[in-house]
Amino acid sequence: MAAFYALPSFILERAFLRKAPRALGETAAVIFTSGSTGEPKGVVLSHANLRANIEAVAQVYQFKAEDRILGALPFFHSFGYTVTLWLPAVTGTAAVYHANPLDAKTIGSLIAKHRVTILLGTPTFLTAYLRRIEPGQMRSVSLVIAGAEKLRAEVVAAFAEKFRVTPLEGFGCTELSPVACVNIPDV
């Protein structure tokens, strides 16, 4: 209890004082990206941008109460920020977090321990998982979505063969909050 009182007042105020509701058009985040141009820029995303993107993804995949998302994508990237931070929070989907997406040994252990059902990552991360995660650790995973870079056919084939789940590809950019389109299962 003493540690609670040691917190700075601005943290206590933020945690316990009600804030005025935010308008959907207000800025929710500024995500920095160099995108395809190579020129760094800050992309302003509104609450409406994020909400629409999250609702669209949730509508496509229709998450179930027993689903668990592995959140290993960095929050400074729009893919991680939207689908591994905010999507679970908004949809009520459970999430398991790990700070290093290339720590495949720990990722595999977390997937098995928490029976993760949804894995989101880049093709680079999926390639690392192919090398270092055992098939038994991935038994609970029923949905894999890759984004942020091109998903090569050989990675899809190797992942499907080793783990018995076919990665789906998403496309987007930071300016789109970030998901523009995604493959859907069973099509």
Q: Where do the PLM segments sit?
A:
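Structural detector for helix-capping/boundary residues
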Residues: 25, 47-48, 73, 114
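Conserved S/T- and glycine-rich ATP-binding loop of Class I adenylate-forming
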Residues: 27, 33-36, 69, 75, ...
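Gly/Ser/Thr-rich phosphate-binding loop
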Residues: 116-121, 130-187
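Short beta-strand->loop structural element characteristic of the AMP-binding/adenylate-forming
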Residues: 1, 8, 42-44, 71, ...
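Conserved AMP-binding A3 loop
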Residues: 28-52, 180-183
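Conserved AMP-binding/adenylation subdomain of ANL enzymes
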Residues: 51-68, 78-117, 132
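Conserved structural elements of the adenylate-forming
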Residues: 6, 11-13, 43-64, 126-130
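Conserved pre-ATP/AMP-binding loop-to-beta segment of ANL
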Residues: 2-32, 39, 62-68
